[in-house]
C-alpha cells in the first residue's frame, strides 16, 4: 500500500480489513506514517481532546494471573492492598477531577468480577457522582453478569471499560485464568445493554507487531470508539519485570497504526507515557487524541494541569 495515498483514502471512507496485508505498517517510514495518522485525526476527529481519570477503588488480591499486573495474587509486588474505598472519598476525588475539566471518571477495581456488597458500594458511589459531579461516568469492574451491568446502568454509568489486552493468538501467553472469549463476551454484553465501551490493550509484553495489528483490527470490528493504548512499564515482582521497555519510535508506530485502522475512535494514551519524551507529546501528532490524566492504578500518572497546558499549546481544544 502507498502510505502517502492511504490517509486520503481513509478520510474518503476506506476502512482497512483483516483480510488485507497490513504488515507494511511495521516497516513504513515512521515520519510519513505519523503525519498520515495526524491528518486522519484532524479531518475525522477535529482538534477536540478527551481527558479521563481513574481511581483505584479496590486494590490487590486479584484471583487472575495476568502476567503484567501488580495486583494479581499470583505476584508479590508489595503494592498497597485495600478493600473498597469509602464512598465519600471517591465522590470528593471525582469532584476534584470534574472541577479541573476532566471529561470522564471511572472507578477501577481489582478482581475477576465485582459482585455482592462491593457492587452495591460501587453503585452507591456512581449514583452520588451522577448527582453531585458534572462529569461522565465510566466503570471498570471485570467480567460482569447482566444483572451487574444493569445495576451500573441504573446508577448513571454510561461507558464500560474492558481491555482485550492483546491479540486473540497471544492472549493465552499473558493470562490463563480467563479467556479472550470471556473478554469479547463481556464487551458485547455491555454494548447490547446500551453502554459505550472503552477497550484497548497493552503493548510491550513480548508480542509481535502482527499481534498489535490483530488487536487494532479486532477493536475496529467491535466498533470500539475509545481505545486506550498502554505501554508496559515492567513492575518488579511480576512475570514481566525483566522485559525491556519499548522505544518511543515503537510506541509512535503503534499509535499511528491504530489511528489508520480505527480512524474515528478516540485513541487514548494510557500507562507508559513516561517512556516518551515530554509526556508523549509526539504521540499527539501521530494519531492520539485522548489520554488518561492524573495517577493510574499502581503507577504515577501525569499532572492534569500540565497535560491541559501542553495540549492547548499543541492546538487541541479541551
Swiss-Prot record:
Cofactor note: Binds 1 [4Fe-4S] cluster. The cluster is coordinated with 3 cysteines and an exchangeable S-adenosyl-L-methionine.
The protein's required cofactors: [4Fe-4S] cluster; [2Fe-2S] cluster
Residues binding [2Fe-2S] cluster: 106, 138, 198, 268
Species annotation: Alkaliphilus metalliredigens (strain QYMF)
EC id: 2.8.1.6
Keywords from the named record: 2Fe-2S, 4Fe-4S, Biotin biosynthesis, Iron, Iron-sulfur, Metal-binding, S-adenosyl-L-methionine, Transferase
GO biological process: biotin biosynthetic process
This protein's name: Biotin synthase
Catalyzed chemical reaction(s): (4R,5S)-dethiobiotin + (sulfur carrier)-SH + 2 reduced [2Fe-2S]-[ferredoxin] + 2 S-adenosyl-L-methionine = (sulfur carrier)-H + biotin + 2 5'-deoxyadenosine + 2 L-methionine + 2 oxidized [2Fe-2S]-[ferredoxin]
Molecular-function GO term, any one: 2 iron, 2 sulfur cluster binding
HAMAP family with a match to the protein in the record: BioB
Amino acids binding [4Fe-4S] cluster: 62, 66, 69
InterPro entries: Aldolase_TIM, BATS_dom, Biotin_synth/BioAB, Biotin_synthase, Elp3/MiaA/NifB-like_rSAM, rSAM
Pathway stated in the Swiss-Prot or TrEMBL entry: Cofactor biosynthesis; biotin biosynthesis; biotin from 7,8-diaminononanoate: step 2/2
EC top class, as a word: transferase
Ranges for domain Radical SAM core: 44-270
Family: Belongs to the radical SAM superfamily. Biotin synthase family.
Function summary: Catalyzes the conversion of dethiobiotin (DTB) to biotin by the insertion of a sulfur atom into dethiobiotin via a radical-based mechanism.
Gene3D superfamilies: Aldolase class I (3.20.20.70)
Assembly and oligomerization: Homodimer.
